[in-house]
C-alpha cells in the first residue's frame, strides 16, 4: 500500500530568504528590496570599472577623448546586451518553480534531458565552483575601492586604507552569525539613495561636455574595437567589470520575483549607472588627470567624506549579498549531493532562507583578508576579477540553451539562434579576461579549481560508495520475507532506520539483528530524497508504503533549497495513519569509517580526499534535526 501525504496547515511552504511570500508582500516593497540585495554588486562597479577600462585603453598613458568615448560606449552596450537582454528579458523566464541561479538552472536542465545528464551536472559544478571565486573577490575589491576614496581627502589616509578595509571586512563576517534580518530592511532604501546620488552627480560634468552623450551610439564601440586591435581586446576584460553582478539578477529570482527585479533594473539601476558612466567619461575628457579616481572626483570637495561613507556602506551591502549567496549555494550543493553535510544555522525563525554556515564564513573571511593583504589596491585586485564571472555566464548560456530547447521545447535551431549571440559575447569577454591570468586572474581560477575538485570528488566518491554498498548489502525484500517466516524476539516501540538505499537492508538493521537478536514491533525504513525543485509542496512531502505487518517504508522529499527537518515531516505521516510517537521511537543510523582500497575506481589521492571530506561532514543527527536522545548510532568500516 502506498499513500501520499495530504497538505496540512502544519507544513506551510517556507518563505524565502529576503522577503515574505510574494502573495503578501507589496510590489513596491519587493522592488525596493531587490534594489538593496540584487543590485549591490553591479551598483558599486562605477567605483572602479570605468577607471580600469580607460586605463587599459590608454596604451600611451594619456586618456584620449576618442578612447574614452569608445570605452563608455562599450560599457553602455554591455549593460544593454548582457544584462538587459540576456538576463532581464530572457533568463528571468527560465525559472525552476520560481527559483533562479546556476544550480537551479542545472536541476531544470537535467529534467529535460535523458542523455547527457552528466554533462549538465559537470557544467553546474563548474559554475558553482566559479561562484566561490567571485564571492571571495567581490567583498575585497568593493570595500577596498570605497576606502581608497579617503586618499582624495588627504594623502595622510594612504597608509590606513588596507588596515581599515581589513577591519570593516572582519566586522562584516563577525556579525553573520547573528543574522541580517534587522538591518536587511535598510538595504533597499540605502541602495536607492546610492543610485539616485551617483546618477544626479553625473549631471554637472555631462552638461559641461554634452558631446559625451554621443557615446550612446554603438558605432563608437565598434569603431574603438576595429581601430585598437589587441589593446581593444584587452580593454574588453576591464569593460566587463561594469557587468559583474549580473548573475545576481537570476540567482535572486526566487527572493523577489521577475517583475520587481525587471522594474528596478529598467527604471532605477540602469539609468543611474548609464548616467554615472557618462558623467565620469565627461570628467576624464575635460581633464585627463581625473582618471586617477573619476568616481569620487565628480563630487565637490565638501561631499567627499559623506560619499566615502556612503560608498563604504554600499560596498558592505554588496558584499553581504554575495556572502548570503555563498551560504545559499552551499546549501543547494549539499542537498544536490555535491558537497558533504555542513552545519547550517538558521538566523531567523520567520524566514527559512536566512542561514549561516560557520565553516563557509571562516573560509571566506580568511580568503578575503588574504586577498586584501596580497593585492593592497583595487587596481591590482581588479585584474583578478572577471574570470570567474565570465566563466559562470558562459555556463549559464549553455544550460540556458538546453532549457530553451528541451524544457521550453523550441527547435534546436531557434534555441541556438537566440543563445548563440550571447554565448559568443560571453566567450569573447572570457577570452579577454584570460589575458589577465598572470596579473591576478589565477586567483579565481585556483579557487574555482579547488572547489570543483571537491565537488567532483564528493559526487564521484558518493556514487562509488553507494554502488559498492548495494553489492554488499542484503536485499530488503528478502530480509523482510525471512523475518516474517522466522521472527526473532520482539521488543516494544518503533525503530526508524535511516538509509540512502531503500532497496537494501540498512546496515544498522543488520547489526541490530546480529548483535541484539531482537526486532521492534514496528520498523520503518526511512529514505530522504532531494527533488530537482527548490521546494516541495506539503502534499508531496511524505510517501508511506506498508511492505509487511511489521515493516513499512517512508520516503521524505525535500527541495534543494530546503533544510531537512525529519520530525516535522514525520508529523505528516501521523496524519496518514502511522501511529508515530517520538518518545517511543528510536532512530538507528550507521556511521561509516572509510578506508581506501587498492582498486576503488578513483585515484589514490582522490580516495584520501573523499575520506577526509566524509570525516568532516556534519553529524546526520544534527543535519536532519533528529532529537539526539532518540538516536542509536552503529559504526561500520567500509573500504572504497
From Swiss-Prot:
Keywords: Cell inner membrane, Cell membrane, Ion transport, Membrane, Potassium, Potassium transport, Symport, Transmembrane, Transmembrane helix, Transport. GO terms for molecular function: potassium ion transmembrane transporter activity; symporter activity. It holds the Pfam family K_trans_C. Belongs to the HAK/KUP transporter (TC 2.A.72) family. It catalyses: K(+)(in) + H(+)(in) = K(+)(out) + H(+)(out). Residues 1-15 have a biased composition (Low complexity). InterPro entries: K+_transporter, K_trans_C, K_trans_N, Kup. Its main location: membrane. This is Probable potassium transport system protein Kup 3. PANTHER family: LOW AFFINITY POTASSIUM TRANSPORT SYSTEM PROTEIN KUP, OSMOTIC STRESS POTASSIUM TRANSPORTER.
